[in-house]
A protein has these predicted regions:
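Glycine- and acidic-residue-enriched helix-capping/strand-helix junction motifs
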Residues: 1-3
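Hydrophobic alpha-helical
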Residues: 5-7, 19-20, 25-88
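Conserved beta-strand scaffold positions in the cores of enzyme catalytic domains, especially
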Residues: 18-21, 77, 98, 126, ...
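Hinge/cleft segment of the Venus flytrap/periplasmic-binding protein
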Residues: 9-11, 102-153
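A short helix-to-beta-strand connector/capping loop
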Residues: 14-17, 73-74, 94
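Short beta-strand elements at the ligand-binding edges of bilobed clamshell
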Residues: 21, 92-104
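Short amphipathic alpha-helical segments
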Residues: 59, 81-85, 93-94, 105-109, ...
Length: 153
């Protein structure tokens, strides 16, 4: 898994240690169960959680809050997708950072590529739709952009 390899490399280069990886198949209920297990195994807390989907990150956050876990209140939690519920959690201070995978751009560029292919034009084998790191510093601009594109109400 390229994402896992790059994650491990970045953590190690920063002087950190990956304690473990929990595979949850993008299922929030499995993420909640995994979070329960992590909290039992590491009752003192962990520094950070990298969760590969926003729905799973929100399930982990709910688990922390439901268990009133003081040891995990300061854990840096990173989600992926940039969906509205996760960005709202970031705005409330529950999620620390979110990586938006730019679904709008993915869809737009996919249609452009399909139209080019239908017209007999060459299409790049890799089309980068970008990603955006969302934090408390740029959340307002991200929300405004989503609303401007009609993605959020």
């Amino acid at each position: 898994m390229p994402c896992l390899h790059s994650y491990r490399s970045a953590v190690e280069q920063a002087g950190g240690t990956v304690l473990e990886v929990q595979y949850c198949d993008a299922q929030p209920d499995r993420a909640a169960a995994a979070m329960e297990a992590v909290m039992q195994k590491y009752p003192q807390g962990v520094d950070a959680l990298l969760v590969t989907s926003d729905d799973m990150a929100l399930a982990a956050i709910k688990c922390i809050w439901d268990n009133n876990s003081a040891a995990y209140q300061k854990t840096v939690i990173c989600g992926f997708d940039g969906n509205q519920a996760a960005v709202e959690a970031l705005d409330r201070g529950e999620l620390t950072v979110d990586i938006a995978q730019q679904g709008y751009e993915m869809g737009y560029k996919a249609v452009e590529a399909a139209l080019d292919a239908l017209e007999g034009k060459s299409v790049e084998s890799v089309i980068d739709s970008g990603s955006e790191v969302i934090t408390a510093d740029n959340i307002d601009a991200y929300i405004a952009d989503c609303r401007e594109k009609g993605l959020w109400s």
